[in-house]
Curated annotation (Swiss-Prot):
Name of the featured protein: Recombination protein RecR
Zinc fingers classed as C4-type: ranges: 57-72
Alphabetical list of PROSITE patterns matching this protein: RECR (PS01300), TOPRIM (PS50880)
HAMAP family in UniProt: RecR
Organism from which the protein derives: Bacillus velezensis (strain DSM 23117 / BGSC 10A6 / LMG 26770 / FZB42)
Length: 198
């Protein structure tokens, strides 16, 4: 169906979001058109504000509105332990359980040869640079329990094995093929408790 250009552009914009197909994009576009103008403007301002004012922490790679982020700045956190995760959403999921008190390192992806993503395309070099600090004694690999996450964890473990740093992998209380961001706090807590040394 032919829509007026402003609606077509709105539909196209929604389709750029993950998991949004043509039908959902049309529904969202018409929902937005039915909203009050001030609500739409607030929504648009929130999008622009988030894009302009958020950045990635120069230390750990977590999303933040200050650099370094609040986690890296917190002097009460254990700087001898780094938990390696794939995405900023995984940091948020780990923080929800309120049991982990170390630092994080966000890779911003996972090794995936099928998608053309190699070790140099994610933040592994930055991790290695951070580990040159003698203060770090343990690395917890909390990549997703899927093929890409496992490949990434194995690659990092092979790199770090000679360093003498204690390596562990979160336990598989998480469903294989799942993502950390969708796990509940109890499942994450059990997975962290049951991590194993590599």
């Amino acid at each position: 169906m032919q829509y007026p250009e402003p609606i077509s552009k709105l539909i196209d914009s929604f389709m750029k979001l993950p998991g949004i197909g043509p039908k959902t994009a049309v529904r969202l576009a018409f929902f937005v058109l039915g909203m009050k103008e001030d609500t739409v403007l607030d929504f648009a301002k929130a999008l622009v504000n988030a894009k302009r004012n958020l950045t990635y922490c120069s230390i750990c790679g977590h999303i933040t509105d200050q650099d370094p982020c609040y986690i890296c700045e917190d002097t009460r956190r254990d700087k001898s332990v780094i938990c390696v995760v794939q995405d900023p959403k995984d940091v948020i999921a780990m923080e929800k359980m309120k049991e982990y008190n170390g630092q994080y390192h966000v890779l911003h992806g996972a090794i995936s040869p099928m998608d053309g993503i190699g070790p140099e395309d994610i933040k592994i070099p930055e991790l290695l640079k951070r580990l040159q600090d003698d203060q770090v004694t343990e690395v917890i690999l909390a990549t997703n329990p899927n093929i890409e996450g496992e490949a990434t964890a194995m690659y990092i473990s092979r790199l770090l094995k000679p360093s003498g740093i204690k390596l562990s992998r979160i336990a598989h209380g998480l469903p294989v093929g799942g993502d950390l961001e969708y796990a509940d706090e109890v499942t994450l807590s059990k997975a962290l408790e049951g991590r194993r040394e590599l």
